[in-house]
C-alpha cells in the first residue's frame, strides 16, 4: 500500500553477503504478511526494506534511510550486531523495534520499546547443555565455535558454564576466526586427539 495513511514498517537485514539467507527469508515473510493483511482491507501497511549486509555501519545507514522515509515501526535488524546499533537509535528516537531473529541478550536492554521474538544466545547455550546432560549424550565434549561472531561466542560462553554446572566434561575448545569458516580440519583434529 502506498497510501499516506498506511503504517510504515522499515525492515533491515542482510539481503546480500554471507548472512543473506537470514535477511532474505525475513524480507520474504514480511512481504507476504503485509500483502495478506492489506488484502483484508482496513488498517494498511507499507514495507520498505534496506540491506545492512550484517554490518553495523551499514545497519546504521539503513536505519537512517528508513527513518528518512517516514518509518514508524522497525522490523529488524535480523542479526545481533546490527541490532545492537539500531536498538540504541530506536530507543533514542522512540521508534518501536521488533527483531525477529537478533538473539543477543543485550538487544532489549536499550529501551522499553525494543523487543525480540526469538530465543536469546544464553538460552540456546543453556538449553543445549541441559539437553546433552538430560539425555546422556556423551561424557566428553568438544566445542568448536566462531570466535569472531557475537552469536557463536555468546552461545559458547553460556553452554560452557551450564555444561560445567551439569558435570559435563568439555575436553576440547577450539575457536576459529571469520576468515577460516570453510576448513575446520585443524580444530576437529585437535578435538579428536
Which role does the model predict for each range below?
Residues 34-38, 160-163:
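Conserved hydrophobic residues forming the short capping helix/wall of the S-adenosyl-L-methionine
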Residues 21-28, 36-109, 117, 177-182:
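Beta-alpha junction/loop-to-helix N-cap segments that form part of ligand/metal-binding clefts
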Residues 60, 67, 133-134, 192:
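Non-catalytic positions within long, well-ordered alpha-helices that form the structural scaffold/packing
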Residues 70-71, 137-138, 193:
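Short, high-confidence coil segments that cap the C-terminus of an alpha-helix
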Residues 1-13, 39-44, 133-140:
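Immediate post-signal peptide segment of exported/extracytoplasmic ligand-binding proteins
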Residues 5-27, 77-78, 140-146:
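Short beta-strand segments enriched in small/hydrophobic residues
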Residues 15, 114-179:
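An alpha-beta-alpha
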Residues 60-63, 129, 185-189:
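Short hydrophobic/charged patches on amphipathic alpha-helices used for structural packing
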Amino acid at each position: 500500500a502506498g497510501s499516506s495513511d498506511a503504517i510504515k514498517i522499515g525492515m533491515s537485514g542482510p539481503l546480500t553477503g554471507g548472512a543473506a539467507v537470514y535477511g532474505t527469508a525475513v524480507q520474504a515473510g514480511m512481504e507476504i504478511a503485509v500483502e495478506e493483511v492489506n488484502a483484508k482491507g482496513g488498517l494498511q501497511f507499507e514495507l520498505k526494506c534496506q540491506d545492512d549486509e550484517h554490518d553495523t555501519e551499514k545497519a546504521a545507514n539503513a536505519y537512517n534511510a528508513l527513518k528518512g522515509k517516514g518509518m514508524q515501526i522497525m522490523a529488524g535488524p535480523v542479526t545481533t550486531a546490527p541490532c545492537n546499533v539500531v536498538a540504541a537509535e530506536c530507543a533514542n528516537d522512540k521508534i518501536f523495534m521488533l527483531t525477529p531473529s537478533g538473539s543477543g541478550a543485550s538487544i532489549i536492554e536499550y529501551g522499553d520499546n525494543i523487543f525480540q521474538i526469538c530465543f536469546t544466545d544464553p538460552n540456546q547455550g543453556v538449553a543445549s547443555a541441559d539437553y546433552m546432560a538430560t539425555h546422556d549424550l556423551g561424557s566428553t565434549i568438544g566445542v568448536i565455535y566462531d570466535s569472531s561472531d557475537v552469536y557463536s561466542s555468546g552461545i559458547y560462553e553460556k553452554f560452557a558454564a551450564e555444561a560445567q554446572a551439569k558435570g559435563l566434561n568439555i575436553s576440547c575448545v577450539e575457536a576459529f576466526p571469520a576468515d577460516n569458516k570453510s576448513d575446520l580440519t585443524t580444530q576437529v583434529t585437535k578435538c579428536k586427539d
